[in-house]
Amino acid sequence: MDSNTVSSFQDILVRMSKMQLESSSGDLNGMITQFESLKLYRDLLGEAVMRMGDLHLLQSRNGKWREQLSQKFEEIRWLIEEVRHRLKNTESSFEQITFMQALQLLLEVEQEIRTFSFQLI
């Protein structure tokens, strides 16, 4: 896992938490939770790829891992749309920078998960 990606996730989560304190938006809290979940899932897939023998463990532990993978891609698409929507509607430069970084990170993570999943298939 790229250390820049880890720090990017942490930075964006901290920034979103600051925005949440100012706006008390429940939707933003949901986005933060999904970002954290997505990071954990990506990390697990990355670890499974590093230890290719874990593919069988992954499949036996979760017989529906392809279905779960599909669900994660849907979550990523939803997050991308939500971030784009918020980016269009915000006038705060702090929020614009945060959402632009979040969008870039989501696209990078989507590509990483695709790469990991192809290696596992």
Curated annotation (Swiss-Prot):
Coiled coil: none
Annotated function: Mediates the nuclear export of encapsidated genomic RNAs (ribonucleoproteins, RNPs). Acts as an adapter between viral RNPs complexes and the nuclear export machinery of the cell. Possesses no intrinsic RNA-binding activity, but includes a C-terminal M1-binding domain. This domain is believed to allow recognition of RNPs bound to the protein M1.
Gene: NS
Source taxonomy: Viruses, Riboviria, Orthornavirae, Negarnaviricota, Polyploviricotina
Subcellular location: Virion; Host nucleus
Sequence similarity: Belongs to the influenza viruses NEP family.
Main location: virion
GO biological process, one term: exit of virus from host cell nucleus through nuclear pore
Motif stretch (Nuclear export signal): 12-21, 85-94
Keywords for this protein: Host nucleus, Host-virus interaction, Transport, Virion
Protein name: Nuclear export protein
The organism of origin for this protein: Influenza A virus (strain A/Gull/Maryland/1824/1978 H13N6)
InterPro entries hit by this protein: Flu_NS2 (IPR000968)
Subunit structure: Interacts with protein M1. May interact with host nucleoporin RAB/HRB and exportin XPO1/CRM1.
GO cellular component: host cell nucleus; virion component
